[in-house]
C-alpha cells in the first residue's frame, strides 16, 4: 500500500483495544487486559497502573509497528453505565468521567510517544446506549447539561489526532440523526467539546445507520 502511494508513513489503521476487541488474537492474547481491568488498577494500585498500562501500550505499539500499522482506534472514552448495552461494558475504564479522562490522557500520550496515532471513541459518548449499535439505533434522552458533565466530559481537552463518532441519536439535541450524520452534533463536538482534529466514522455497515450513503 505504501509503495503504491509513495509514502512510507501512509496511514494504516487497526482496531486493537485489547480485551475482547483484538484483531491480532492469532499473534498475541490480550483477552484479560480489558479497559475495565486497567481502570480498577488506576483506582486501587495507581503505581502499578502506571508501569503496567505503559508496558501494555509499549508492547502493543511494538507489535503494531512490526506489522506496519501506525494508527490504533484506542482509547475508548465511553462511560460504563449500569443498565446499558454490554457493547461497551468492560471496554470502558470506569463509571467515573474524571477517571476515564485521566486514563485516556495517559493512553494517548504514551501511544504518541511510541509513534502510534490514536482514535478516541465513540465521541461524544456511547455509554448510555441501551441497544447495540451494530444492530439497532440507540436513542439517548438525557439533556445537554447532564451529558456535558458525564458522557461528553472525557472527550474534552484531548490531543488525539483522530476521534471516531458514535452511531447514536441524542434526542434532546438532534432527534432525527445519529451523531455521524448530524450537523448539530458535529458542531457540538467542535465547539462545546472542543475537538478540532480529524473526525472519522464508526463502521458504516452498522445497522444503526439508515438510508443510503447519498442520503
Show where each model-derived region lies.
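Second-shell residues forming the walls of enzyme active-site clefts
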Residues: 1-3, 102-106, 111-112, 116-215
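N-terminal beta-rich core of secreted/periplasmic extracellular enzymes
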Residues: 1-80, 93-94, 99-100, 109-116, ...
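Short glycine- and Lys/Arg-enriched binding-loop motifs that mark or flank ligand-binding interfaces
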Residues: 14, 90, 121-123
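Short acidic/His/Gly/Ser-rich catalytic and metal-binding motifs that mark active-site loops
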Residues: 21-24, 80-85, 127-131, 172
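Glycine-rich tight-turn/loop motif centered on a GG-T
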Residues: 30-51, 84-103, 131-149, 173-179
Amino acid at each position: 500500500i505504501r509503495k503504491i502511494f509513495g509514502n512510507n508513513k501512509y496511514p494504516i489503521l487497526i482496531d486493537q483495544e485489547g480485551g475482547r476487541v483484538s484483531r491480532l488474537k492469532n499473534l498475541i492474547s490480550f483477552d484479560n487486559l480489558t479497559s475495565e481491568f486497567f481502570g480498577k488498577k488506576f483506582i486501587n494500585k495507581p503505581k502499578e497502573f502506571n508501569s503496567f498500562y505503559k508496558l501494555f501500550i509499549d508492547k502493543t505499539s511494538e507489535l503494531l509497528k512490526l506489522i506496519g500499522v501506525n494508527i490504533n482506534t484506542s482509547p475508548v472514552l465511553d462511560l460504563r453505565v449500569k443498565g446499558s448495552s454490554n457493547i461497551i461494558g468492560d471496554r470502558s475504564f470506569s463509571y467515573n468521567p474524571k477517571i476515564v479522562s485521566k486514563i485516556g490522557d495517559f493512553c494517548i500520550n504514551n501511544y504518541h510517544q511510541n509513534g502510534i496515532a490514536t482514535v478516541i471513541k465513540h465521541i461524544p459518548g456511547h455509554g448510555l446506549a441501551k441497544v447495540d449499535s451494530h444492530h439497532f439505533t440507540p436513542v439517548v434522552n438525557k439533556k445537554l447539561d447532564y451529558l456535558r458533565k458525564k458522557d461528553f466530559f472525557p472527550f474534552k481537552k484531548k490531543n488525539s489526532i483522530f476521534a471516531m463518532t458514535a452511531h447514536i441519536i441524542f434526542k434532546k439535541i438532534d432527534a432525527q440523526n445519529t451523531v455521524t450524520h448530524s450537523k448539530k452534533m458535529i458542531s457540538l463536538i467542535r465547539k462545546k467539546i472542543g475537538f478540532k482534529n480529524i473526525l472519522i466514522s464508526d463502521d458504516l455497515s452498522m445497522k444503526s445507520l439508515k438510508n443510503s450513503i447519498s442520503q
